[in-house]
Amino acid sequence: MVCNSKKSETESPRGRPALRTGFSSGTAAAAAAVAALRYLISGTSARAIAVKLPSGLYLGVPVETCSLRDCVASAFVIKDGGDDPDVTNGAQIIAKVALLRNDPEKMCGKNPQPPQIILCAGKGIGTVTKPGLPALPGEPAINPTPRQMISENISLELLRLATFELEGLQDKACDVSDTSLCAEKAALRLPLNANAKAKTVLGPAGTFSLLIEIEAPRGEELAKRTLNPRLGITGGLSILGTTGIVRPFSHEAYEQTIHAAFSVASSTCAKTVVLSTGGKSEKLARQRFPELGPEAFVQIADFFSFAVREAVMLGFSRIIHSVFFGKAVKMALGYPYTHAHAAPMDLQFLAATARSLGHKEQLCQRLSLANTARHGLDIIAEDGSFDIVEKIARTAVEQSVRVADEASRAAVASQSAPIRIRLLLFDYDGNLLAEAGKEA
């Protein structure tokens, strides 16, 4: 079955305009690689490529241009993330493909070199420098699923090409010294999972292999707006994707990002992670904990419970939350996910907290009628009743401890000592209002 990438939309609740899905950078890279191979071998310039996804479905991906220079064919695809607000949306993903003559000595020796795919990162594609990520240090930042997609779709294209009468392959091939592809960065060697008929395109007895370089012309610039610098990915973007499809505002994608950040922190032997909801709360926490490495600071957005569970499962012994008042209230309410669409602010809870501390009913009524959490905090500050803030902080920590305990019980190997959890609660000007939990 072939899906049209231009018409794939998510269902729209309550009559809101549907959000259009798109395709991942991994799908874009696979499409570009197939288009370049087709142009190199057959001279056909594809307008679109049907990319086989991990699910087994096919997705039609438009191809912008194909070209040939010397022995290297190029094709580029514009990454279309649909309505997902990703910085790579609209980025050019280019694949350059060359037919590489295999070393005759290896071919004729006891261990003949089989046809293979040599895949590397070109301009604007990052290189992994830290452990804890799906790709190993020194490898191109091309994740396992995109690697598999490139390998499988190239193999399928070779099978398609094998049905044609192809001539002059020797004239299309080059030696390593004839091309600058993969000259500066580490390369991956991927198996060519093609049947014998498909491999005949690469000549008798594995005469040729395929050299594929993936580029993103603006990748280094765009990567500065991603988590790559923090994750230790240098020089550009990552080629990502687990399904090949990008779903707008995907929870799964953000959870994978949090998990990756934790994995990097764990690989540095960090025992503490500082969970912030965004850049400002992270900056405030960094000022308080200059002794912690940059990997220890993880922005979790609204994924409160997920982040705590992941931290426990990965064996961290201390969690520090850095939050503003509104998020602290939602944490105290026990919301696992604190985004406004899923977790409406309950200011009656704020009023009930004030009552439990013996405050006058007039203050409690004002809090119950506040417009926002920020407004509620202004009322508290005006009254000088900061014990309410401290109570909210303590309750938020209790909820975090509850989530951590549940995760510990669910883990195969529970931690020998309870995880220590601490919370720093800031006002909207960056002043520390309250601390709660262990070490507070």
Predicted segment positions?
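Short, conserved catalytic or adaptor-binding loops enriched in Gly and charged residues
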Residues: G203, A413-Q415
